[in-house]
Regions:
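Active-site neighborhood of HAD-like aspartate-dependent phosphohydrolases
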Residues: 14, 18-67, 178
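Short catalytic/ligand-binding loop motif for oxyanion handling, primarily in non-cytosolic enzymes
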Residues: 37-39, 45, 91, 100-104, ...
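Short, acidic loop-to-helix structural element flanking the phosphoryl-transfer center
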Residues: 55, 63-93, 100-105, 109
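Structural beta-sheet core signal
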Residues: 93-95, 165
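Short, aromatic/basic amphipathic alpha-helical patches
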Residues: 105-118, 175-179
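Conserved Lys-Pro-Asp/Glu-containing loop-to-beta segment of HAD-superfamily phosphomonoesterases
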Residues: 122-127, 132-133, 137-171
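Acidic, Mg2+-coordinating phosphoryl-transfer loop and its flanking beta/alpha structural elements
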Residues: 160-198
């Protein structure tokens, strides 16, 4: 059965109180571009310009025309530190995709090669911008990272009480939190890890 676009507007939020008791129940999601993967450097490599210097239609056309663009991106300078700090919590990857369908498999291939753990790709970028299963199946096995590709605006469909998203796009925070989740606005690894520890999601050092 397809998982349709969510419509919940629940504000039941998992706050700081009691988080330590629920630590094992927290579900971690981590974005790729701008968090683990250096998307900006990739764009600059193939265009000679920074992403914000390009009109969106030119940027995405270049991404679509560059063979294996997402698969060949490098890590953010502090991306491996972040991943190594959270991978013990059995996180899933939650990453937005452009309209070119081949980009979905490219992102999954990057994760399979780079994350150092078994992965399972689940494509949720459905027709008419729906959040529904297009291909793949979520693994429930411990230690397997589900790589969930979806439309960015639908990331909140994965949110619920205890769901933690690390993402660099602040515009996604409101909808994620409205469904009960915890949003970590990523600007760098040091700050994100500090916030996770402050909330009791990661142990203090």
């Amino acid at each position: 059965k397809a998982e349709r676009t969510c419509t919940s507007s629940s504000t039941d939020c998992c706050g700081e109180k009691g988080l330590n008791e629920q630590q094992q129940q927290c579900k971690m999601y981590c974005d790729l571009d701008g968090v683990l993967v250096d998307f900006d450097a990739g764009i600059q490599r193939v265009t000679g310009s920074k992403p914000h210097q390009l009109p969106p239609y030119i940027l995405w056309a270049k991404v679509a025309s560059t063979p294996d663009f997402f698969e060949n991106l490098g890590w953010m300078a502090d991306g491996k530190e972040l991943w190594n700090s959270i991978k013990g919590m059995n996180p899933d990857i939650l990453t937005g995709v452009p309209t070119a369908k081949k980009c979905r498999a490219q992102k999954a291939a990057w994760c399979e090669r780079e994350l150092g753990v078994p992965t399972s790709h689940v494509d949720m970028a459905g027709t008419k911008k729906a959040h529904e299963v297009v291909s793949g199946r979520r693994s429930k096995k411990e230690g397997v990272v589900n790589v969930i590709t979806c439309w960015s605006r639908n990331k909140h469909c994965e949110s619920r009480r205890g769901a933690v998203l690390i993402d660099d796009r602040l515009s996604l925070q409101q909808d994620w939190v409205a469904r009960g989740g915890i949003f970590i606005h990523h600007t760098n690894t040091r700050k994100s890890l500090g916030e996770l520890r402050r909330l009791g999601i990661l142990p203090s050092i």
